[in-house]
Amino acid sequence: MSSSQTLPKYVSIVSTNRWIISKVSSSLSTSGVIPTIKYRLAYRLYTTLWSLYSMMLHILGFLANIVGVKSFTIFAFSPADIAVYHFFNLIFPCLETSNKYFNCVILCTCVSVYNLLQDRSCSWLKLLL
């Protein structure tokens, strides 16, 4: 068997796109037949890569929210901040047994959001409220 007759190790993008288009058009043209495209390799690869990309965007968005925390104001706990701390401990009791660093990040984010909501001098916050 020559090398031209063997299947390629990796499927190219052009052949994958052609295959998807042909399967979609053939499944739309035939009536009464349930298309089995979701079980094909190209569809599984597409959905897997898309879900990983979506998950990466969610993680980056969460990290961007953490970076936006005002780092020096979160350590000056006022009575309102202590009340917020106890309030979020009541809402998320499972966080007491988890990682302490993760607890600190969530607490700092919650306290910062609470402080931003109390601070009416922010011009962009006035537009939102």
From Swiss-Prot:
It is a multi-pass membrane protein. The chain crosses the membrane at residues 49-69, 72-92, 101-118. Its main location: membrane. Keywords: Membrane, Transmembrane, Transmembrane helix. One of its GO terms (cellular component) is membrane. The keyword DNA damage does not apply. It is found in: Membrane. The keyword Transmembrane helix applies. Almost completely overlaps APS1. This is Putative uncharacterized protein YLR171W. The lineage of its organism: Eukaryota, Fungi, Dikarya, Ascomycota, Saccharomycotina.
